[in-house]
Amino acid sequence: MAEKRPLGPLGPMMYGKLPRLEPDPGPGHSLPLSASSQDSCNYKGAYFSCPIGGTSKAGSERLASWTPYPSLYPTGVAGSPLRGDNLLTNCLLYRPPTEGSEKIQDSSELLPFGPQAHAYPGPPLAAPKPVYRNPLCYGLSTCLGDGGTKRSLDGDWTLVTGPLLPSADPPCPLATAPGKGQPLDGTFLRGLPSGGPGKDSSLPFSPCQAFLEKYRTIQSTGFLASKYTSPYPGDAKQAMSEGPSSPWTQLAQPLGPPCQDAVAAHYPLPPPPQALPCPPSCHPEKQGSYGSLLPLPPLGAHKGAAYQAGGLGSPYLRQQAPQAPYMPPLGIDSYSYSSAPLPAPSPGLKLEPPLAPRCPLDFVPQTLGFPYARDDLSLYGASPGLGGTPPSHSQNSVQPVPQPGAFQRACQPLPASQPCSEPVRPAEKPTPEAQEKMWLPSCRKEQLQPRPNERPGVPIVIRDSPVPRTSPALHPCAKERQSVPQKDARPPSSPPMPVIDNVFSLAPYRDYLDVQTPEPRAERDSAPATSKSQDKDCKGNLPAQDGASRSHCSLREEVALDLSVKKTMAEGVPVKVPSPEVHEKPAEAVDGPGIENTVSGLPGLKKMVTEIPEVTAEATPRTNFHSSVAFMFRKFKILRTAPVPAAIVSSPTTPAPVPAPAPAQPVPNPPSVPVGLQILTQPLPVACFNLALPSPPAIVASPAPASAPPPSPAPAPAPASGPAPSSAQVPTAAPVDSPEQHFTGLHTSLCDAISGSVAHSPPEKLREWLETTGPWGQAAWQDCQGVQGLLGKLLSQLQKFVCTQRCPFPHVVRAGAIFVPIHLVKERLFPKLPPASVDHVLQDHRVELRPTTLSEERALRERALHGCTSRMLKLLALRQLPDIYPDLLGLQWHDCVRRQLGGFDTEARTLSPSEPTVTRDEPESQALAGKLPAPKVKKPGRKPPTPGPEKAEAATGEGSRNPSPSSGASTSPPGPTLRARFRNLLENAWLNGVALPTWGHKASGADRSSPHPQLLGSQTHHL
């Protein structure tokens, strides 16, 4: 509503510029402090009340007794006493018609208050009688109390009508205006006509208006001369164009006529709003400064005048907000206060120290033209002009809504949720009464742009201001002025917003992703969600300023809000710093590095990948869209890389059955493919490998060759699987994938490897091992070729049984634990070991065998163990088998060595090993029967002469197999000589690495020779 009122040069801002007088100005100042405690407007300064003419002696005396600080006033003004006959009305200093303008200048220069802010001259003062009596408090009787002196002033304001200024309200003495107003410069009264202020005048203007007009016409008054040539009723825009070029021209100047007669009667007269430091027509950034440093008559005075232009009578006005004290420039005439700002920044502004962007600007005058009090800066809002750091947000100072004049920008704080994206008067915190700061929606639609060419005054840096603030709607003048800096301002580097009602499109981002700009950040609002709507309004209202405002907002956010984005900006295009994105988006953290690796070879994709973390990092306002972008890119990446892994995996999977390691090799071959692809392809080769792993060992004999070929120097390991599997080959072939067969095959291969190692070792070495190694001979047998690998596989199988609780052997489950009968260890796995030795190992490991219950024993017997005794059915925890298994293997090795070195009596050696084989001819132990005849490992050596094994007891057979060592003794007759000869042959065969025929099972020997080709065939088939 305030915006709709007619534009006038005077607005509430002018009233806000009245200075606060120090409560204790000094020895030369006798200004009494008025009851500041009664000030409901939080005004704590002294109230200076002046009677009109001589109506109130107390007021006149008070004025006479007051003398200004000489140092603060110009030299010509310092010594001149305040003229008692001058009329210092509540709102208007006007002189009696008898005195000349010179005297008025003297007296006016001494006045530190009054309508000083009106820097523009008005037409000649036509109305001799001041019309306004209402003090600055706008009828708030509690403002200054009802002193007799103040009441006496009422008589002089006889023109005031009841509706305009309720007579009941004591006019706050002009000093209240000083609290809010500007010091009355000498120039303010220089324009007073010598005969203007007589009470006999009946012109329709308010005296203030007439005074201002007169003030405006005076060209010789100093700082106002030649500045305000437009007539009083002249158009505001005309005044704007005619604005002075003084350093103050950039300050907000009222655009409307100085006074518009009593229209404000329609509105109640609440206290003046906090004067907006900066009208929209001028610097939007000078929010903290005394934006319109126009000398303003006190609000009360203009209020009676129906200050329409200022909107003072509007119901929006609440309590008088503490205003920043106005500080006049160095001299009265040193700066001219123009009613209209020049479109171009005045050069005088450049003299001021440069201001940090987005900081409210203020001018610090070198010399103050009036004594002002800065004891409580909080009352002033943030008044950096005082030279001290203003309180950024005075929590306890009531700062009502600034009622902007029609010409003024309403600077209005936004909700706290919105971060401040532009400089705003820091003191304008919303108060209970300030809730209607939201009354003007356009005020929140603007984002203030600091103009680089105008940085005068001391910057007010709002460090931790939680209250987001936006500058009010800019005047056309300000828009024009701001459009100039926008030309050189860099447009936002991000593409247009593609989200419409949560429906996104990547089309706008195509060029954005392909061609990165130095700052490829999406449009960023200073506020997360609420600023979105604000932005929409801003775009509608200020399309020209949108780009620059965005860039400035983003700059501010970099400093205050989003450090990660700032880092990415600083680092530039090539490196986009995925680390912030990893912290902010843990869900995408996994993808971020992977994506970069994946597309390392693809430059086009690399750009998109490096960009995605950046976009997602700043996605706070538009999380849905950016997460969607990330998701789309993730999907795109998968589609892009999926075909490659398929090709890679398919090639290894087809040959996978033959070599298990084959799948692993093709995968490393495409390291030319990005690492990201390997991440996708690796699981498949691993899966293939896992699938291939069970199949080869499924056959009892297959694992042995698989591990045996690596140790090529020793041909023993491969045939080791052949001895007993000849008989076990047929049953095992059917259940190829049986875990039991797999485990049994591993165990058999391991035992055969140990036996072969012992058979190939010379007796001296074996004796040395027996002496040096421990009771189980771990160190010796673990050095055997292929033993370590087989042992690892077998132990892993046992662990797998324990973890999966799927044991292939007869077992019992107790409380989730698997127990196997000891029969598995003593009869099936290690049938050659003496039971006492196995028990000894169990004792060493403190393994407890638990008896079975009747039901468990019945179940075990029904399952497989029909003829087992109860001792053999005692339970061993399967989880303990991996612990004792290596020691049991050590026992196996030790037994083999002992048999190898036991008695060289061939008869004893032939009988002892064969007996266990005969007794253990049961089907369940057939697969393990071949372990005992360890010398069978040398079968490859015997393989060419197949009949060799059949002549185990004939010296000729041995001679034919090894003619070189035993050729001379081959003709010896049988008998004792034959035995000695045989012993000789055995020793030679041992030294030559030939398998020792120490057992008499000729049929089994013949069978042993034949199944070996089948084993090889089966191995090739399955592997």
UniProtKB/Swiss-Prot annotation:
The keyword Transmembrane helix does not apply. Transmembrane segments: none annotated. This is Uncharacterized protein C15orf39 homolog. It comes from Mus musculus. Residues 425-436, 443-454, 477-490 have a biased composition (Basic and acidic residues). GO terms for cellular component: cytosol. Residues 963-972 have a biased composition (Low complexity). It holds the Pfam family DUF5525. The modification N6-acetyllysine is found at K17. The keyword Acetylation applies. The lineage of its organism: Eukaryota, Metazoa, Chordata, Craniata, Vertebrata. Residues 706-722 have a biased composition (Pro residues). Residues 1-35, 381-501, 518-551, 703-742, 907-980, 1002-1023 are annotated as: Disordered. Keywords: Acetylation, Phosphoprotein. Residues 391-400 have a biased composition (Polar residues). It comes from the Eukaryota. The modification Phosphothreonine is found at T389. The modification Phosphoserine is found at S206, S383, S493, S494, S912, S964, S972.
